[in-house]
């Protein structure tokens, strides 16, 4: 299997509407649904929810 089949690169986009994104990898086998994480958004200087963008 290719490296990108199991753990593809995804973008996490801020829900604060700032357009700030994080880039990471996720395991499709363990997490088939879209993920959301609380991460720091430096534009609003707060921790906000970041959701997976497709």
From Swiss-Prot:
A Pfam cross-reference name: Ribosomal_L33
A Gene Ontology BP annotation from the UniProt entry: translation
One GO cellular component term noted in the UniProt record for this chain: cytosolic large ribosomal subunit
Stored Gene3D superfamilies: Ribosomal protein L33
Keywords of this entry: Ribonucleoprotein, Ribosomal protein
Superkingdom assignment: Bacteria
Record bears the keyword Coiled coil: no
Family assignment from sequence similarity: Belongs to the bacterial ribosomal protein bL33 family.
HAMAP family reported for this sequence: Ribosomal_bL33
NCBIfam families on file: PRK00595.1, rpmG_bact
PANTHER family: 54S RIBOSOMAL PROTEIN L39, MITOCHONDRIAL, LARGE RIBOSOMAL SUBUNIT PROTEIN BL33M
Protein name: Large ribosomal subunit protein bL33
InterPro entries: Ribosomal_bL33 (IPR001705), Ribosomal_bL33_CS (IPR018264), Ribosomal_bL33_sf (IPR038584), Ribosomal_zn-bd (IPR011332)
GO molecular function annotations of the record: structural constituent of ribosome
């Amino acid at each position: 299997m290719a490296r990108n089949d199991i753990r593809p690169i995804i973008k996490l986009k801020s829900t604060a509407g700032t357009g700030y994104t994080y880039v990471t990898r996720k395991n499709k086998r363990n997490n088939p649904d879209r993920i959301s994480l609380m991460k720091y958004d430096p534009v609003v200087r707060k921790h906000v929810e970041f959701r997976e963008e497709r």
